Amino acid sequence: MDAYHELAYSYDRLTNDVDYEATVSFYEQIMEREGVRPRTAVDLACGTGSVALILARKGIRVTGVDLSEEMLTMACQKAESLAYPPQFVCQPLQRLKLPRGVDLAVCALDSMDYILDPNDCREAIVRVYKSLNPGGIFIFDVNTPEKLRSMDGQVFLDEDDDVFCVWRGEFDEETNICSYGMDLFQREGQVWHRSFEEHQEYAYSRDQLTDYLCDAGFTHIKVYGDRRFGPPMPGEQRIYFSARKGIVK
């Protein structure tokens, strides 16, 4: 079954420990350093819209883009109470096309790693560049190859009321892809329903992504550790990138 099909309906409960506010706060710190004050933004691979909603509540006009219709359904439901909710669009990132330019593009929670073909990743970054206004900024994070390799052979459990998930990691050195076989159990009344999804992430290196950003035309490329300023440390599990489009002087 496709990734984020059945999982979409339990995703927020299984990830209730994710601090989206802290992630957006780090974006804001980066933008403050770069002198960017966005009025418009796109949240790439937005999932159930948690980051998009935080940005929208700050008065930013937001578009959320994701490949999963089920995740976008949940995002729309969460946005119903907002006076100016994000607009949500179902698109693959390598075919990203927005009706107008934006000042900020973000891609949270290692979602870029889900692009399994490096050529598609390169094209996605080009599309992001074209979607940004001059002086705009692109901020995203990825899992490091070290982290994805460490997942090989590991078994993980996540649970909340009425939902239970067990997943197993397997890293393939030939393809550079980490696969997660995920068994999901969701309860409806007295009945438990089981489904299976496979999630995969490509282990992009820091140099590889830096090259893609440069080739797309980005400048002022910076790489940070996990929600902290300063270069990534040895063994870092997540790193952040920020890059600018043609700063207007």
Q: Where are the regions that the model predicts?
A:
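A short glycine-rich, Lys/Arg-flanked "PGG" loop and its adjoining helix->strand segment in the class I
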Residues: R122-P134
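Residues lining the SAM
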Residues: A108-D110
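C-terminal lobe and adjacent flexible extensions of AdoMet/dcAdoMet transferase-like proteins
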Residues: Y202, R206-K249
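A short acidic, Gly/Pro-enriched loop at the edge of an enzyme's catalytic core
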Residues: K97-L104
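Conserved class I S-adenosyl-L-methionine
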Residues: M1-R37
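A short His-aromatic
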Residues: D113-I115
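SAM-dependent methyltransferase
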Residues: I139-T210
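Class I SAM-dependent methyltransferase SAM/SAH-binding core
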Residues: V42, G49-R95
